[in-house]
Amino acid sequence: TREVMVLEFSSTVVALILAGKVGSNIASEIGTMRITEQIDALEIMGVNSASYLILPKIVATVIFFPLLTLFSIFVGIVGGYAIASLTGMMLPGDYIEGLFYCFEPFSITYALVKGAVFAFIITSISAYCGYYAKGNSLEVGRASTRAVVVSSITIMIFNLILTHIMRV
């Protein structure tokens, strides 16, 4: 269970949750700026709107999502310890021993890399959907929904690819 928590569950589930929350927020924020012509105003002033609006979001998520993945791993392991101890299914010493038995430190690196890749996917897809939104506020909602759906599917595909590439 440690392997599943560290290698697959934490990074993927955190990414899917954040695709829904962060992805929709980014797409709707940038889409609203496009609809209200704020992006056009930036371009008229000579500002590269894509790097000004999107790059800070990508950098922030690529740094922060792996930290959330670490937190998710920690909470999952502590939760497993609490349940095993409180229900009497396992002795606390056995649980701790099982955590360290055949532990590969690369597993943590693997989870952090996946978190960073998923962060880039979520942010770039959501920013793209918002940046190219056209029409009215209904289109912003559609762009936000499209960003979440495409990000979620892409995360699952890249999860498979990264698992095949990085699995030792």
Q: Residue spans of the language-model regions?
A:
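Generic alpha-helical transmembrane segments of integral inner-membrane proteins
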Residues: 62, 66, 70, 74, ...
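Membrane-interfacial helix-loop-helix connectors in multipass membrane proteins
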Residues: 1-6, 74-116, 124-143, 165-168
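Hydrophobic alpha-helical transmembrane segments that form the multi-pass transporter/flippase core
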Residues: 18-19, 110-111, 115-120, 146-152, ...
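Start (N-cap) of specific transmembrane helices in multi-pass transporter permeases
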Residues: 48-69, 143, 147
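Hydrophobic side chains within alpha-helical segments
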Residues: 24, 32, 40-41, 60, ...
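Hydrophobic alpha-helical transmembrane segments of integral membrane proteins
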Residues: 55-59, 148-168
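Short cytoplasmic-facing helical segments at TM-TM junctions of multi-pass membrane proteins
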Residues: 30-54, 137-140
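Hydrophobic alpha-helical transmembrane segments of multi-pass membrane transport proteins
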Residues: 1-40, 68, 125
